[in-house]
Amino acid sequence: MGEISPRGGDFDIDYILENASSLEKISLLAGHDFWHTAPLPRFNVPSVRVSDGPNGVRGTKFFDGVRAACLPCGTGLAATWDQSLLFDAGVLIGQECLAKGAHCWLGPTVCIQRSPLGGRGFESFAEDPYATGKLAAAYIRGAQSTGVISTIKHFAANDQEHERISVNAVMSERALREVHLLPFQIAIADAAPGAVMTCYNKINGQHVSESKEMLDGLLRKEWGWKGLIMSDWFGTYSTAEALNAGLDLEMPGPTRLRGPLLELAISSRKVSRSTLDERARTVLEFVKRANKAEVSTVESTRDFPEDRRLNRKLAADSIVLLKNESGLLPLNLKALKSAALIGPNMKTAAFCGGGSASLQPYYSISPYQGIMNQLPPGVEIIYETGASSYVFIPELEASEVRTPEGQPGLRMRFYREPPSVKERRVVEETILQESSWQLMGFSNPQLDRLFYADIEAELIAPATGPFEFGLAVYGSGSLFIDDQLIIDNTTVQRGGNFFFGKGTREEKATVDLVKGQLYKIRVEFASGPSSKLMKPGVVNFGGGAGRLGMVQAIDPELAIARAVEAAKRADVTILGVGLTRDHESEGFDRSHMDLPPAVASLVTAVLDVAPDAILMTQSGTPFNMLPWADNVKTHLHAWFGGNELGNGIADVLFGVVNPSGKLPLSFPRRIEDTPTYLNFGSERGQVTYGEGIYVGYRYYEKVLRDVLYPFGHGLSYTSFAYSDFAVDTASATLNVRNSGDVAGAEVVQLYIAADATTSSIARPVKELKGFAKVTLQPGETCSVSIPFDRFTTAFWDQEAHVWTCEKGQYRVMVGSSSQNILLEGVLEIKETTTWSGL
């Protein structure tokens, strides 16, 4: 391959296909490197840059990359239920792409959350396929309005991390169509994303990246898809099969399964030259379109005031007020004398989930910071952590350590040889701002796949007492303090969830430190090929990774006791608990819904002495809130809220913003209640989608199962009245009035129910088929119209293999949640019709 081209000029696709050699055409069909397509300099075809991820644009580096805007996670964006706002969010994503020099954004994610345990559930929008498709379409339209290309992913049913590259997702044709493909179908029809990324998994026995039925038959022929189909990273598993099925682009590069293997496949007539030309044409069309984007020539930043304002609105509008029984919120700042801010999530800025969604933010605002920013002088603040909730021991930040030369941070030096070789030459050096490193995509021409690195820093102990250190690696590593071996994660390794499930467990050791004393820290690291672990079904991203953590050991009982005393003293107690990217991440699924035991005990203990405490929970997907959730009076839920998380929370707490978020997921009472309790995770390479079409609220309603908080639920500081409901063949209309004292926004949700006595097939109790968000001043009334479309009454007939709209009467319901239906009407379909395609 040649050098990566700068932005090229125009090029003639037909001319290239007529005059390029087979080797040149083949080179187009795999990435040049981790983040770029291959150029053809002879024909003025440039390289195109792609970049993750669903809630921000990381750029080309997991390791030592440029900082970026971080938006709320997918479920947080969906909680706004605001298609106009998601368009604006997409515009910001597109602008970030341009600043990072990226022509193509690898997002959004639209796989359905079958289970609360799915590691990437926070990346997707909602448990409902219709809502997911509509919200994703708005996000895509916004991003593509800037000229960049969106890549909708992961096609399809990539909803668990366990053995994700090998698991066979077995489901009915109806479940596949009505639940798992429908978000893609709606978003493609409404927004025309420029690319589709295939999933890692199999569906009904075949990897989707080599399924002719899924890629050529359904996506290209039935849906008329004209855009690019790319693999997920290292998600190409064959040469001829994938090419013939319709997979245009293998990512990342350099190629593993094209190149010489594709030459052989063409020579042996397993792949025709016409197929080669078809795939090359699609890639060239993609590059031609992408090259029109006015991207920066260098990876840069754009942390502008208007971006911060938008991100703050996204954070605030995503927050869901679950309970406000005593009317405590919004808090009256003028009457506030003292406040206890308690909990492990209070000073943690959990701005994003883990994996492809993670990035280095321009900045992050913790709930504690956000609250402090708005408190007037004179309010007494009592802060207590109360309990630890981390999975991995917290990383060392640059402010806590210095390099041997005295700079903030940790010095990382790369070598060709191991530490046993004296007088090694330093090949590359960088300064880490935190004590973790992910080296997939990292390369240096002087280093082989097996290379070595020393991470060194000086630590001045902040206190006297026991400190816990932890080291997790993909590769191998050992921790030394003052040249004494403290942790050996080289000789014997135990598999864990670190680094997309490829790495080790975090090995730990406790060391007594003396306040003010200087300690020399060194990690001797070797890259991925030195690992002793082998795991089935796990993506091999290569490179290597490591994470060093340090935390002062605390007595759990004493920490809770201090929090209880703080709650007793304060006028108002705000308790912040939940999950972080340690708990929710690409690479692994949660094994349970529970909080760490100490955190659950903390909540119970604080509520016992402060029953009016405000509970602020945070996560991307539901977690176990029993037994205390039934007793709490005031409860709001934030998500992984992006850069402005803490400011958004404070805006809602103090009434700067009237909460308008609604749950895009049902919050179950127990994991045992969920539709996938018996059918989640790979068993001998297979997972059966036994719930069929009954995902989320559809399941809970069908089996009469109570939930803690229903799909679509969310309260406001004002109230709304619905009236004058009318239904015709094209739409449903109603009036909504703000009957309260403050301005606010309401999400009107429309559900359809088939008549069970006349329907020829089992249907959900009701299905979401439309929604609209309106903002009203006190006393203001507006008319809301929600149009019907071809999906309004349709189901997939898996015998005839078509969508069917069956004649009969359908109940049309509108309400403020799936369980709070306020008005009903009737839609009559006079004759049965069938259809296919988009």
Curated annotation (Swiss-Prot):
GO molecular function: beta-glucosidase activity
Enzyme class: hydrolase
Keywords attached to this entry: Carbohydrate metabolism, Cellulose degradation, Glycoprotein, Glycosidase, Hydrolase, Polysaccharide degradation, Secreted
Pfam families associated with the record: Fn3-like, Glyco_hydro_3, Glyco_hydro_3_C, PA14
Pathway where it operates: Glycan metabolism; cellulose degradation
One cellular component (GO) term of this entry: extracellular region
GO biological process, alphabetically ordered: cellulose catabolic process; glucan catabolic process
Positions annotated as active site in the UniProt record: 232
Localization: Secreted
Chief localization: secreted
Residues covered by the PA14 domain: 405-564
Assigned EC number: 3.2.1.21
Residues linked to a glycan: 19, 324, 489
Catalytic activity reported: Hydrolysis of terminal, non-reducing beta-D-glucosyl residues with release of beta-D-glucose
Family in the record: Belongs to the glycosyl hydrolase 3 family.
Function description: Beta-glucosidases are one of a number of cellulolytic enzymes involved in the degradation of cellulosic biomass. Catalyzes the last step releasing glucose from the inhibitory cellobiose.
Descriptive protein name: Probable beta-glucosidase K
Organism: Emericella nidulans (strain FGSC A4 / ATCC 38163 / CBS 112.46 / NRRL 194 / M139)
